[in-house]
Amino acid sequence: MSRNSAAGLENTLFQLKFTSKQLQKQANKASKEEKQETNKLKRALNENEDISRIYASNAIRKKNERLQLLKLASRVDSVASRVQTAVTMRQVSASMGQVCKGMDKALQNMNLQQITMIMDKFEQQFEDLDTSVNVYEDMGVNSDAMLVDNDKVDELMSKVADENGMELKQSAKLDNVPEIKAKEVNVDDEKEDKLAQRLRALRG
């Protein structure tokens, strides 16, 4: 392997490690912002339902963003580990080449041609990966992380309210919800708490 190829591989390893750290930092930032939105949700629960839902949606988006960032960081770490192995192989091969200049046959038995071919494939794959990682910020977080299910919003609002001994401030929609007759309620429904029933009625 040429010096340029070796330097390129080591540079890719550096870029991968740097990218992984940056993704971890962004994940930590998303985690802090998730907590901030959750705290805002706690304060708004008994004041305004619409605002509460906005804070709940924001918290869920930040949670999804954090998970996406951590998954991507894990993938980058995995590839960096393979690059590190490739760099080590190159260093070992170079050392042996300097020490055993006259041992051509021994080196041939190590199948250096195959090692070179594998390294060439490694470099090409990692150059492509490096390009993909560099455009990450232009792409933004995976679109799935930006979608928030209304059921998850309701679930988070209910959870926060329960944890803080609060009762959700309901909208005027509840005034028009028909009263559920006892005979229409099955055993499982009777076991559900009142807050969950109100949330279902609100979504209806």
Swiss-Prot record:
Q: Where is the composition biased (Basic and acidic residues)?
A: 185-196
Q: Which organism is it from?
A: Saccharomyces cerevisiae (strain ATCC 204508 / S288c)
- Where do the segments described as Interaction with VSP24 lie? 1-103
Topology of the protein relative to the lipid bilayer? Peripheral membrane protein
Q: Name one Pfam family in it.
A: Snf7
Entry coiled-coil feature ranges: 9-56, 109-129
**Protein's name in the database:** Vacuolar protein-sorting-associated protein 46
Q: Which parts of the sequence are annotated with region: Interaction with VSP4?
A: 104-204
Which InterPro entries does the annotation name?
Snf7_fam
Family statement drawn from the similarity comment of this UniProt entry: Belongs to the SNF7 family.
Q: Which GO cellular component does the record give, naming just one? A: multivesicular body
Q: What is its main location?
A: membrane
Sorted keywords for this record are:
Coiled coil, Endosome, Membrane, Phosphoprotein, Protein transport, Transport
Other facts noted in the record for this chain: Present with 2440 molecules/cell in log phase SD medium.
GO terms for biological process, alphabetical:
endosome transport via multivesicular body sorting pathway; ESCRT III complex assembly; late endosome to vacuole transport; late endosome to vacuole transport via multivesicular body sorting pathway; protein targeting to vacuole; protein transport
Location relative to the cell: Endosome membrane; Endomembrane system
Cite the residue spans of the region called Interaction with VTA1: 176-204
